[in-house]
C-alpha cells in the first residue's frame, strides 16, 4: 500500500494514495496553486534583487577557518548578493540570509591547491568534488590528494567531498620545448613523429599515426584552438604546415584536427593503469576522456564489476565521433561532462552552446548528473575578477539545468583559486534564486515499477514546493534522492543513507545534501534522529516543517508498504 501522510506535532494524518488519474488531477491543481504562488514570490525576489549590489568584490585574505562561531562553510562566505540584515521580509516572502547552493562545484587539484591547507579552504569555500587530472602529476602526488580529501571527510562528518579521477585519454600532444616558441601568422611550421625534436620551426608529436591521420588542407588546432595551422604537405615522418593564427607554443600542448578524431583507443594503456590506481584508492567517479561509443563504457564497467569496485563512470563528451552516439553513450554511463575545450576544437565553435544545451537536456531526461566544464572562469587564472561573459556563462549553465560546474586551471595552477570558487558559488546561488520551481508529471510511458517511484518523487516535490519545506529522504541505494533531484525542488534534499559509498556519490547531484546515518528498525527513532541531526547542525529550526520521503524495496517504515510521504513539524 502507498500512502501520503501529513502530520502535526508528530501525529500523522494519513491519506491513502488514489488512482493515477485522480493523482494527476490533484497534482495539476496543486501545481497551478504553486505556479501562482511562485509568480508572486518571483516578483518579490526581483524587488529584493534591485536592492542588492551587483558588483563582485574579492578580498585577498583567505577564509578564516577558526571562526568563533565554528568552522566556516561555503554558506558563510559573504557574497555581493547577500542582504545586509540577517533575516528580512518583503510582503509575505521571507528572505533567507543563508541559502544553500544546489549546483555543485568541481575543483581540479594542482600545484596551487594540493596542500592540506588549500584543500581545506577549497572545501570550506564551496568545493563539492575534487578532480584529479591524470594528464598531469604522478600517482604519488594524486595519492597525497586522495588521502587529504579523505582526512577532511573523516574530520568533518557533516561535509562530503567526492573524488573524481579524470583519465588522460588518447590525446595527441606536442613534445617538450626548452622555451616557448612564438608562432607568427604565415610562418611555416612542422610537426614530426620523431621523438625529442624541438627547434624554431619543428616540434615532435607523441602519436605515431599522426602523419596518416591528417590530410593536406586539414586545420590543426593547438591548445584548444589558441593557435591554428593549415596542413600544406606531408612526408613519411613530417607534416608541413602554415600558421593561420599565431601564439606561444609551450611544451605538451594538445593538438586537434578540426572535424576529425585520432584513430586511437578511447582508453589507453596509461588510462588502465590510472583506473587501477583509482580502484586501489576507492575514488568515487571516473571521468573518461574522448568516449566515442557506448562500448567503451561497457568495457570499463565490466572491469569495475570484476574488481568489485563501486565507482561511477562519467563520460566526457569532447569528440566529434561521440555526437552521433550521444543517446547510447549517456544511457550506458552514470553521468556526463560537457568538455567544451576539445569539443570546440573538433567541431565548429558555434555548435558548442547548442550541444551543451542538448547534452544537459538528455542527461536530465535520463536522470543522469551532468557537469559543464572548461574555460568557465579562465581569466581568473591570472586575474582576481572574472569577465562579465564568464559570469554569464556560469549563469547559463545553471539555468540550463547543469548539476555541476567545473574549474580546471583556475584552481589547479591559477593565482586566485579561492576567489574563483567564491565567484562560482555566488553566481550559481544568485541564478538559482531566479529559477522557476514548476514540476511536470512523469510520462505515462515509464514502466510501472519505476513509474511509482517517479510519481512519488513528483508529488513529494510538488508538496514541498507548495508548503516551502525542505525534503528528507531515507535511501539505501540513492535512487529516490536522484529521482527527487530530477524534479528540482526549490529547497534542499537532505538524503540520509546508511551506505558510505552512496553518500559520496550523491554529492554530485543537484540540490542533494547527503548525510550518513545508521537506520533503526524503529521508524520513529530513525525520523527523530534525522531531525535531531539537522537541528543540531543548524540546518533546520524548531517549529519548521519538513517533507519526509521514503521509497524502496527495503523501507524503514512498514514492511507492507514501499512508498511514503509525510509532512512533519520539527519539535524541540
How should each PLM-predicted stretch be described?
Residues 2-572:
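Non-catalytic helical/linker scaffolds that mediate oligomerization, partner binding
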Amino acid at each position: 500500500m502507498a500512502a501520503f501522510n501529513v502530520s502535526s506535532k508528530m501525529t500523522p494524518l494519513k491519506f491513502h494514495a488514489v488512482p493515477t488519474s485522480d493523482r494527476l488531477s490533484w497534482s495539476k491543481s496543486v501545481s497551478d496553486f504553486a505556479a501562482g504562488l511562485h509568480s508572486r514570490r518571483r516578483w518579490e525576489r526581483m524587488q529584493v534583487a534591485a536592492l542588492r549590489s551587483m558588483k563582485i568584490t574579492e578580498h585577498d585574505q583567505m577564509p578564516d577557518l577558526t571562526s568563533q562561531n565554528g568552522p566556516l562553510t561555503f554558506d558563510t562566505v559573504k557574497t555581493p548578493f547577500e542582504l545586509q540584515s540577517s533575516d528580512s521580509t518583503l510582503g509575505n516572502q521571507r528572505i533567507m540570509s543563508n541559502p544553500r547552493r544546489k549546483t555543485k562545484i568541481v575543483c581540479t587539484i594542482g600545484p596551487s591547491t594540493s596542500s592540506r591547507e588549500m584543500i581545506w579552504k577549497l572545501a570550506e569555500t564551496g568545493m563539492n568534488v575534487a578532480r584529479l587530472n591524470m594528464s598531469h602529476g604522478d600517482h604519488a602526488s594524486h595519492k597525497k590528494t586522495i588521502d587529504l580529501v579523505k582526512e577532511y571527510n573523516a574530520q568533518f562528518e557533516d561535509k562530503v567531498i567526492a573524488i573524481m579521477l579524470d583519465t588522460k585519454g588518447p590525446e595527441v600532444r606536442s613534445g617538450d620545448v626548452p622555451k616557448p616558441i612564438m608562432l607568427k601568422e604565415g610562418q611555416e611550421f612542422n610537426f614530426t613523429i620523431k621523438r625529442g625534436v624541438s627547434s624554431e620551426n619543428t616540434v615532435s608529436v607523441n602519436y605515431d599515426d599522426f602523419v596518416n591521420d591528417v590530410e593536406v588542407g586539414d586545420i590543426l588546432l593547438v591548445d584548444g584552438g589558441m593557435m591554428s595551422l593549415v596542413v600544406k604537405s606531408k612526408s613519411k615522418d613530417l607534416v608541413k604546415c602554415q600558421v593561420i593564427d599565431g601564439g606561444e607554443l609551450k611544451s605538451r600542448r594538445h593538438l586537434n584536427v578540426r572535424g576529425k578524431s585520432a584513430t586511437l583507443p578511447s582508453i589507453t594503456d596509461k588510462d588502465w593503469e590510472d583506473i587501477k590506481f583509482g580502484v586501489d584508492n576507492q575514488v568515487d567517479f571516473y571521468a573518461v576522456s574522448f568516449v566515442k561509443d557506448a562500448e567503451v563504457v561497457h568495457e570499463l564497467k565490466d572491469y569495475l564489476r570484476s574488481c568489485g569496485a563501486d565507482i561511477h563512470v562519467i563520460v566526457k563528451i569532447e569528440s566529434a565521433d561521440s555526437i552521433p552516439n550521444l543517446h547510447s553513450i549517456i544511457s550506458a554511463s552514470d553521468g556526463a561532462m560537457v568538455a567544451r575545450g576539445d569539443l570546440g576544437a573538433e567541431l565548429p565553435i558555434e555548435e558548442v552552446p547548442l550541444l551543451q544545451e542538448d547534452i544537459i537536456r538528455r542527461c536530465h531526461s535520463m536522470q543522469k548528473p551532468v557537469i559543464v566544464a572548461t574555460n568557465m572562469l579562465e581569466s581568473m587564472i591570472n586575474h582576481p575578477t572574472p569577465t562579465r561573459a564568464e559570469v554569464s556563462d556560469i549563469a547559463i549553465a545553471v539555468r540550463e539545468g547543469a548539476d555541476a560546474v567545473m574549474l580546471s586551471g583556475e584552481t589547479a595552477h591559477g593565482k586566485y583559486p579561492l576567489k574563483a570558487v567564491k565567484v562560482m558559488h555566488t553566481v550559481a546561488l544568485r541564478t538559482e534564486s531566479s529559477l522557476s520551481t514548476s514540476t511536470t508529471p512523469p510520462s505515462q510511458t515509464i514502466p510501472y515499477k519505476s513509474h511509482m517511484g517517479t510519481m512519488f518523487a513528483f508529488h513529494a516535490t510538488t508538496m514541498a514546493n507548495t508548503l516551502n519545506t525542505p525534503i528528507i529522504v531515507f535511501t539505501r541505494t540513492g535512487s529516490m534522492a536522484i529521482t527527487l533531484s530530477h524534479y528540482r525542488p526549490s529547497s534542499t534534499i537532505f538524503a540520509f543513507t546508511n551506505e558510505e559509498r552512496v553518500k559520496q556519490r550523491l554529492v554530485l547531484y543537484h540540490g542533494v545534501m547527503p548525510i550518513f546515518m545508521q537506520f533503526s528498525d524503529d521508524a520513529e527513532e530513525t525520523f527523530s534522529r534525522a531531525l535531531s541531526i539537522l537541528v543540531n547542525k543548524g540546518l533546520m529550526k524548531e517549529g519548521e516543517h519538513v517533507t519526509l520521503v521514503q521509497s524502496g524495496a527495503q523501507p524503514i517504515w512498514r514492511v507492507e508498504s514501499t512508498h511514503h510521504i509525510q509532512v512533519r513539524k520539527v519539535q524541540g
